[in-house]
């Protein structure tokens, strides 16, 4: 058992690191906006740079993971990733903040691809499903990052101090686990670019489900703290509670998701997930108090936790399109929504209200419940 747990710990450390740094950033968004006096629309453009950095990194890191080995790439990315979170706190001007966000997004996307590739190797080595446990570790990291942000704001810690301390501490605690012994599979690519395929009708509907989930997750990450601060009127420290509750709920649901799918089936779990997300967003939109709105974010977390894993599993089982291309096609919907969704919300929030923005996200969440039958395998 110890022999099997050793590689698991290494991958889990990579997921934890990714989640902690994203949660750390998300929890201090209102502070960064206030420091630079940035309007929501302008900040949406900055968030777009973060997402674009991640999207650009996906194909690059995928090829590097194949040619160099996923574990080696994860180790190579770890230090620049830690440096990038520190740079976000130290950036003195908006242009430098934009550059730091783009680099932070690239490091986040690169680490995401590398540790998922590494996780698939370890899962095969262990001989049983463990992927959900790794994604749960990402959510644990996000909760820890958000909790750190809450503590930092309570004690009025400057953003640059908070981010620097986080980078040094997390690097020291998790770095050794990334160095645990593991030999990744090395693959060679044939000449020519690896392209995506246009999804068939079934995969297109799966893609819409992934889009709805990606939009919800991206909105919670980038705008939950702003919503609580600006709409509900909470203190900056309490604004971190929304994403903390969202992430904590995702942890618990992801730890249970595999057993629920075995018992009820993919479609039923997806349908219940969609209803949970819709109800949670209604609480957020209609709620006027901190406990009620945080409860809404918790239900959002429960609702979105299992959706993307179910969508990718359905894509991999497609009878027409090969698994790799099918997953890549569906991933474009999810990551495109995570990238463009927060940007669009920033623009819409300037023209309308944040409540309307979240209501629209809820309409997309309803698609998950409606389209759930397409996830049957």
Curated annotation (Swiss-Prot):
GO terms for cellular component: plasma membrane. The keyword S-adenosyl-L-methionine does not apply. SUPFAM superfamilies: MFS general substrate transporter (SSF103473). One of its GO terms (molecular function) is transmembrane transporter activity. Keywords: Cell membrane, Membrane, Plasmid, Transmembrane, Transmembrane helix, Transport. It comes from the Bacteria. The chain crosses the membrane at residues 4-24, 41-61, 85-105, 134-154, 159-179, 192-212, 278-298, 301-321, 327-347, 356-376. Disulfide bonds: none annotated. The keyword 4Fe-4S does not apply. It is a multi-pass membrane protein. To R.meliloti MosC. PANTHER family: BYPASS OF STOP CODON PROTEIN 6 (PTHR23514), INNER MEMBRANE PROTEIN YBJJ (PTHR23514:SF13). This is Uncharacterized transporter y4wD.
